[in-house]
Swiss-Prot record:
Residues 1-21 form the signal peptide. It comes from the Eukaryota. The lineage of its organism: Eukaryota, Metazoa, Spiralia, Lophotrochozoa, Mollusca. It is found in: Secreted. The keyword Phosphoprotein does not apply. Belongs to the conotoxin D superfamily. GO terms for molecular function: toxin activity. This is Conotoxin Lt28.5. Contains 5 disulfide bonds. The keyword Signal applies. Residues 22-40 form a propeptide.
Amino acid sequence: MPKLEMMLLVLLILPLCYIDAVGPPPPWNMEDEIIEHWQKLHCHEISDLTPWILCSPEPLCGGKGCCAQGVCDCSGPACTCPPCL
């Protein structure tokens, strides 16, 4: 087998071995991207967002759509924020 054919064969087989060794790519999670996008738009000043991200899905206190974790009430089936003053 000539060198060129051997090189082409190696180049075709090598990526298959690499893909098998690494495994398939992780599944794409649209929900995580939506939450991340919402956080970037509305909650710049708060660092730990995940515990209360569902607490205030619409603009409430300060027009940011966020309320602090300390005032977020998650005792019932859903989390709620206090009314704005």
